[in-house]
Amino acid sequence: MATARVMVADRARAFGGTTATRARRDDQGRRVTIARGIPSRARVVVARASERAYAELGNVCAVLGSQWGDEGKGKLVDILAREYDVVARCQGGANAGHTIYDDNGKKYALHLVPSGILNENATCVVGNGVVVHLPGMFEEIDKLLQAGVDARGRMIVSDRAHLLFDLHKEIDGLREEELSGNKIGTTKRGIGPAYASKATRNGVRLGDIRDEERFATMLRALAADAAARFEGFQYDVEAEIVRYKEIAERIEPFIADTVEYINEAHDSGKKILVEGANATMLDLDFGTYPFVTSSNPALGGVCNGLGLAPRKFKTIIGVAKAYTTRVGAGPYPTELFGDVADKLRELGYEYGTTTGRPRRIGWLDMVALNYANLINGFTHLNITKLDVLSEMDELKIGVAYKLPNGKTTKSFPADIATLEKVETVYETLPGWKEDISKVRTWDDLPENAKKYVLRVEELAGVECKFIGVGPGRDAMVIKP
């Protein structure tokens, strides 16, 4: 019985619900409520809800962004990672910024290291679909170590993963300058050029770093190709080769055949959690092309980026903000301007984790969300930042588009010119004034907040199982 109480308390700490709380401000000025104290009746209720939620998820679970990124995937991954043996990244690179908080409210901004790194019992995997900037990865690893989090022995990187070099960043900037007035709005982290090297078959994979001579030859060829293509290209390839000799020694303990590792983990009954980067509406094939990322954040990219078969996935969680945001250029049907946009941006602190750029703000777009669900087949939804909508008199949800020809559609257009001209058809719902940042159970949410979540659930046809009500790890409501 004592053991059971300890398990309940431990699960409750992941999702909140305590007899006492203390509040502090994080380094961005946001209020973070931190749970403390002994298990209470409320905590037990939360713990039991979390146990039921865990039981539904199964051995292989993917957490994917369903909008334009920045939905809060890292927080859910960090929470769920306590129940999983393996936490894996499958695609993207350092253009994907994930912000997570530990039990003390300390913030960690991660770009390449999987969000499950705070779980001491989990092995973090960087899969073959990720493009890896090794100096940047080691910066993150070193910062984590300074904060008392040691990634050594707990993180492996695929020998098939392609390397992203500083020359790719240089190319990214030169390419953006070439586009002039038609800029994509790239993060200039070199992601697109790195994937281009992969596609044109002159990329360098992590496993190549083990052969010093071959690595040098491949990097020289890559630099020569870039110099021939871009007039203003500047890159000291010989200095980079010397630099990577030291990096090669340091990365060696992390290199592994992750395809074999993750499949053996699955076959032995271990639980695997996949952390998606970017989001479906930025998918190279399904997103608002060409205003997209250079990889496939949808479910297909998960399978390709890890070498894990589709039939092995039981749970696919789509993460969506209670409103929407977007960074960079591209069509955005529910975009808001003026006072409402400014208010939501400040309340939600909507600035890019990777770029620091102010995010564009919009109402929740169910046409886009249902499109993402169509592609991924979500089994559950995680609605995040519901607390940001507090204090609003009324809320709007985009439920359809009115096309330039006057017809109304609930399908997401592929044509960008059409998408830029659509008029959004909205439903209006009543808002709520209560502060919900300390709410930890469904029953304690204001009625109008419940109605909002239930309407999203109804429109999506998918259960909104997890509801984020604040930035802290404990600020999560599980819908019974």
From Swiss-Prot:
Substrate binds at T353, T354, T355, G356, R357, P358, R359. Its cofactor is Mg(2+). It catalyses: IMP + L-aspartate + GTP = N(6)-(1,2-dicarboxyethyl)-AMP + GDP + phosphate + 2 H(+). It holds the Pfam family Adenylsucc_synt. Keywords: Chloroplast, GTP-binding, Ligase, Magnesium, Metal-binding, Nucleotide-binding, Plastid, Purine biosynthesis, Transit peptide. GO terms for molecular function: adenylosuccinate synthase activity; GTP binding; magnesium ion binding. Belongs to the adenylosuccinate synthetase family. Homodimer. This is Adenylosuccinate synthetase, chloroplastic. It comes from Ostreococcus tauri. The gene is PURA.
